[in-house]
C-alpha cells in the first residue's frame, strides 16, 4: 500500500484515540474533584479550595470535548456527558423537593405555620431597595438579617415594619409579627465577635426560639492561597495560616451549636442566617445534626446564594454556592423553601414556610 495512503488512513484512528484519551481524562478529573469535594472537604486545605471554588469551572474540559466528540466518537461523547451530569447534579448540589407529609401533631396546634426570611444585607448595600422589595414579596412573619447594624438601617426598612416587634444586637436585625425579645448573644473568642443572637418569640401557638447566625467567612483564609504565595518560599507558611483560620472557623461553628443547644432546651427552634459554609463542607454536618435544612428538604434546583457581587471569577449576579440556610428542629414540618433571585446584596435571601407539628412550650 502506498505509504501516504496508509498514513491518511491511520489519521482518523489517531484522532479517535486522542479524543477518547482526553475524554477519559476529563471524566477522571471530575471524579477526582468529587472525591476531594465530598470525601476530603475542609479536612485538608486543597479540599477547602474545592469546597469554596466555583464548581462549574470543573466542567470546562468536558464542555470543550463534547461537541468534538459528537462528530468523531459517540463513546467519547457519552463519557463527557456523564462528566457534565456528575458536575451539574452532584458537584453543584442540585436538589429536588421531598414530598411534604402533614403530621397528626400539626392538627393539635391548629396547623400553625409561619414564613421566615433570612439574608445577609451587606450593611444595607449595594441595592437594598431591591432586597427589601423581595422581602416584602414573600409576605413573611419573621425576618432575620445579618450584617444589618441598627444604626444604619434605612428609613424604608423601618417604615415597612414600623408596627412589628424589632430586635437588634450588633450586626443582627430581627423583625417579628409577634412579641419578641432577646434571650442571649453568642460571643465567640475565635474572632472576638458575636456570631449569633437568640430571640424568643411569643406566637399564638406558644413560645419559640429564633437564632440569627453569621459565622466567619472562609474567604480570608483562601486569600492566603494565592499562587504567588503558595508556590514561593513562603508557601508552607501561607498554607499554615490558612489552616489556622479554618480551624478557628470550625471552632466558632461548634461554639454556635453549643449556644443553640443551650438556648433551645428542646423548644421549637429555627436557626437561620449566613453560615458561610455549604452543606457539602465536612464542618456543616457537625453543626446541623438534629436539624433539618429547609432547602434540602423542600427546595428546588441549586439555590445558590453567594457571592452575588464581583468577588470571584464569575460575573456579578451569578452566585455559585449555597452558604445561607434555614434549619429547623423536629418541632417543625417544612412546607416550602426557596432562595431569592435579586442581587440587592452580595447574598441572596432564603425564605421558608414551616408548620408547627408539636405544641410550642
Residue ranges and their predicted role:
Residues 118, 168, 212, 293-296:
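Structural signal for conserved beta-strand scaffold positions within catalytic alpha/beta enzyme cores
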Residues 115, 163-165, 209, 292-293, ...:
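Conserved beta-strand segments of alpha/beta enzyme cores
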Residues 12-71, 78-81, 200, 258-270, ...:
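Metal-dependent phosphoester-hydrolase catalytic domains
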Residues 50, 115-121, 131-154, 176, ...:
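Active-site beta-strand/loop signature of hydrolases that rely on acidic residues for catalysis
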Residues 2-158, 358-361:
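N-terminal, active-site-proximal structural segment of metallo-dependent hydrolase catalytic domains
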Residues 224-243:
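A solvent-exposed, charged loop/short amphipathic helix patch at secondary-structure junctions
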Residues 89-109, 123, 127, 142, ...:
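Structured beta-strand-rich core segments of catalytic domains in phosphoester-bond hydrolases
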Residues 130-133, 157-160, 225-226, 284-288, ...:
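Short, glycine/charged-enriched secondary-structure capping and boundary segments
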Amino acid at each position: 500500500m502506498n505509504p501516504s495512503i496508509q498514513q491518511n488512513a491511520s489519521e482518523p484512528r489517531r484522532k479517535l484515540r486522542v479524543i477518547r484519551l482526553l475524554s477519559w481524562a476529563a471524566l477522571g478529573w471530575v471524579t477526582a474533584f468529587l472525591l476531594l469535594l465530598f470525601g476530603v472537604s475542609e479536612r485538608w486545605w486543597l479540599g477547602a479550595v474545592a469546597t469554596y471554588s466555583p464548581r462549574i469551572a470543573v466542567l470546562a474540559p468536558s464542555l470543550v470535548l463534547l461537541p468534538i466528540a459528537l462528530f468523531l466518537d459517540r463513546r467519547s461523547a457519552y463519557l463527557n456527558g456523564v462528566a457534565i451530569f456528575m458536575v451539574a447534579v452532584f458537584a453543584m448540589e442540585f436538589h429536588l423537593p421531598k414530598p411534604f407529609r402533614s403530621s397528626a401533631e400539626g392538627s393539635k396546634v391548629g396547623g400553625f405555620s409561619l414564613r421566615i426570611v433570612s439574608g445577609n444585607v451587606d450593611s444595607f448595600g449595594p441595592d437594598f431597595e431591591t432586597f427589601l422589595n423581595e422581602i416584602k414579596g414573600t409576605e413573611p412573619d419573621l425576618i432575620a438579617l445579618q450584617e444589618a447594624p441598627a444604626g444604619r438601617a434605612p428609613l424604608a426598612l423601618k417604615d415597612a415594619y414600623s408596627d412589628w416587634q424589632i430586635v437588634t444586637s450588633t450586626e443582627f436585625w430581627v423583625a417579628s409579627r409577634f412579641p419578641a425579645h432577646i434571650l442571649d448573644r453568642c460571643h465567640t473568642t475565635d474572632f472576638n465577635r458575636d456570631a449569633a443572637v437568640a430571640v424568643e418569640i411569643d406566637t399564638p401557638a406558644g413560645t419559640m426560639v429564633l437564632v440569627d447566625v453569621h459565622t466567619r467567612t472562609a474567604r480570608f483564609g483562601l486569600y492566603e492561597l494565592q499562587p504567588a504565595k503558595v508556590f514561593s518560599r513562603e508557601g508552607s507558611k501561607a498554607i499554615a495560616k490558612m489552616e489556622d483560620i479554618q480551624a478557628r472557623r470550625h471552632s466558632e461553628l461548634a461554639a454556635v451549636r453549643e449556644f443553640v443547644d443551650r438556648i433551645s432546651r428542646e423548644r421549637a427552634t429555627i436557626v437561620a442566617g449566613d453560615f458561610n459554609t455549604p452543606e457539602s463542607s465536612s464542618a456543616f454536618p457537625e453543626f446541623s445534626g438534629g436539624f433539618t435544612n429547609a432547602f434540602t428538604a423542600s427546595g428546588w434546583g441549586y439555590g445558590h446564594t453567594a457571592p452575588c457581587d464581583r468577588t470571584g471569577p464569575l460575573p456579578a449576579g451569578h452566585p455559585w454556592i449555597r452558604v445561607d440556610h434555614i434549619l429547623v428542629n423536629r418541632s417543625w414540618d417544612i412546607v416550602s423553601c426557596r432562595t431569592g433571585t435579586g442581587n440587592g446584596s452580595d447574598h441572596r435571601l432564603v425564605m421558608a414556610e414551616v408548620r408547627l407539628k408539636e405544641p410550642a412550650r
